[in-house]
Amino acid sequence: MGKIRIYSKQPKPIVSLSETYTVSSSYKSGRATLRLTPDGEYLFTVYGDIGESTAKRSSTHKTTEQKLTNNMLKMYEEAQDAFTAIHKKSKLRLASSYSVQQNVKPQGAYQWKTLDIKKPSDNEAKNLVVNEARNLNHNPKGSSVSESDFIKANLEKVKKERMDAWDEIQKLFNLIEKAQADRANASFKKVYDASVRAQQEIIDGASHIVDDAFHSFPNTLIVPFIIELDYKYNQAAKCIDVSIELTEDPSLKVPMKKATLKTTGKMSVRAKTQGDLQQDYANTCLSLMYYVACNVFNITPNIQTCRISLYTARKANGICWMEFNRNRFSTLCFSSLDPLLDMMGWPNVANLKVLKTTSKLDSMEKTTFENQIKSQITSLT
């Protein structure tokens, strides 16, 4: 199977923010516009009779400044998290949520119709016989009859004829309805059985289920740089090995500046240090591994072990390898997870250097990297 390429989906850009508001003093009034640039520059423009110093002293100005500052800090945080906290978008499905009972609902049953012809009543039959007797008595060519005798002689016969005719219609109607019900219910059952089989294939982790999921990843995974995935799945062993190639170097795309809040309440923007960028690279690589692992586990509950290996472009060098098991992975809280700390609890291969104020994740020569992975797997079996 060929590699599966996941194209980048860029986070929202950091843009200037501005707001215009009205300022009033005892005798003057005007409008002011405060603009905050991505570089942390506060630009102030006043319109009307009001002075700049007066406008800046207003409570509206202070509120607006705080609002723009908080919104700009949030944009910086979101841009940073798009790289270093990719895993926070993850949510692992519980194995129990894949059950047939929860995912496949009965298709229903055919609703029988009712015959739209009323059952003959005794009064209707009697009225027919009475009318017939009266018609005979009004016929000048016929002999007159006793109405009561005629009713007595013919009522039961007419009642039976009408009921027999209605019964025949009812039987034919029921036969038609049964045929329609049998066809409809057979179709419902066919759809239900197919849905059950499809869900059971997900539960069992059929190979085509895994293949289909990986081919859908370009539409479902959200990453800010191009990656390529390859995998080897063993259904019987309930294990999958996934390799990730960083087709694009994330260190070249991660935000190069960071914003902080000063004691004055304003924000400051500065270029990241080399240590900051090294930390970002390590966080981004590990966050990506957790993110991919979660999405792989969500394919099927049959996957109990997920091994993720991360490489540079074209697999020139290895970066990191980890082996995750579903049971412990299901206990992680991704919203507060620190991958750099958590990775120590998993079997791993990485050239991670923890320095005083930062962590550095260096790549390894490919052969050395893969030999260490084999050694780790052997020691675990």
Where are these regions (language model features)?
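Long, charge-dense low-complexity segments
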Residues: 1-381
